[in-house]
């Protein structure tokens, strides 16, 4: 049986959301995308997205943002993802979490990255950190072109994904900032919640077996 350490990626391994960081990087000169970025900063739009996420478990802004990938070539996205991870994301690594990753790797744990971010990004992130495997949201591709839609979105299904792929394990460590990963954290022998703001501490203090890693 394996000793497994699961690491979330966005706002856990990195200081940023990798989905929108990549979109901002890739479409930095795209007029319509820049307009979209301004619109989603408006409070009414944020409120609608929050309610949609709360009731339906879907990030509407994220879904709409993904439409911008439509008709972009798979190989171009792959090349840009590699550059993005090496040159941009490398400056956003959370040192405290990177130390945890190196520790569990040294202890012989099987390192798994689980993220709702795009698969083409997390593939490069897994290579960068030398992770053993990764799970991410799959983007749909037809004839080597992105359709702007998700083939499989794992944003809210990490717990079920883990149970499906790892039926037996000796020890489990989970490191994430996501409150939606609570069930996965409760399953872990070693559970760490990354607290990026003080309000996160208030949430996690109710769970005595979950250790908070302050990063604010």
Where does each model-flagged region fall?
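Helix-loop "lid/cap" segments that line or gate small-molecule binding pockets
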Residues: 23, 48-53, 59-69
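Residue-level signal for pocket-adjacent positions within structured domains
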Residues: 8, 64, 145
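Metal-dependent phosphoesterase signature
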Residues: 60-96
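Generic structural signal for well-ordered secondary structure
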Residues: 15-19, 57-58, 155
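Active-site neighborhood of HAD-like aspartate-dependent phosphohydrolases
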Residues: 1-52
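C-terminal cap/substrate-recognition subdomain and adjoining C-terminal extension
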Residues: 1-2, 79, 86-216
């Amino acid at each position: 049986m394996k000793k497994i350490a699961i690491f979330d990626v966005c706002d856990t391994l990195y200081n940023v959301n990798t989905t929108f960081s990549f979109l901002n990087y890739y479409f930095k000169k795209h007029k319509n995308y820049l307009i979209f970025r301004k619109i989603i900063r408006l409070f009414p739009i944020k409120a609608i997205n929050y309610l949609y996420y709360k009731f339906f478990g879907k990030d509407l802004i994220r879904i709409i943002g993904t439409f911008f990938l439509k008709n972009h070539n798979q190989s171009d996205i792959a090349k840009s993802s590699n550059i993005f991870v090496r040159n941009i994301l490398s400056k956003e690594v959370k040192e405290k979490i990177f130390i945890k990753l190196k520790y569990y790797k040294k202890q012989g744990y099987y390192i798994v990255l689980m993220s709702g971010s795009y698969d083409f990004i997390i593939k490069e992130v897994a290579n960068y950190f030398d992770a053993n495997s990764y799970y991410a949201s799959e983007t749909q591709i037809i004839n080597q072109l992105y359709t702007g839609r998700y083939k499989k979105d794992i944003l809210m299904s990490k717990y079920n994904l883990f149970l499906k792929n790892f039926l037996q394990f000796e020890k489990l460590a989970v490191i994430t900032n996501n409150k939606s990963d609570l069930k996965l954290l409760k399953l872990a022998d070693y559970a760490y919640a990354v607290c990026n703001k003080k309000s996160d501490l208030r949430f996690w203090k109710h769970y005595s077996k979950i250790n908070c890693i302050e990063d604010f």
